[in-house]
Amino acid sequence: MLRYAIVFFIIALIAALFGFTGIAAGAVEIAKIMFFIFVLLALVSLVMGFTRRK
């Protein structure tokens, strides 16, 4: 699960790079939404990883 958290976090950072810097002008809103979705998925995966270890 922690591996998924890291993967989702990296995807969120890439989406933020495209969405917040204006590189992909046509897809700004989609990239911003994807950023928040993948940050949420990263947090959920992180919490699930910590709770499974106990």
Swiss-Prot record:
Record keywords: Cell membrane, Membrane, Transmembrane, Transmembrane helix
GO cellular component terms, semicolon-separated: plasma membrane
Membrane topology field: Multi-pass membrane protein
Protein's cellular compartments: Cell membrane
Keyword field contains Cell membrane: yes
TM region positions: 5-25, 30-50
Pfam families listed in its UniProt record: DUF1328
Main location: membrane
Stretches assigned to coiled coil: none
Family: Belongs to the UPF0391 family.
Protein's name according to its UniProt entry: UPF0391 membrane protein Daro_2080
Species assigned in the record: Dechloromonas aromatica (strain RCB)
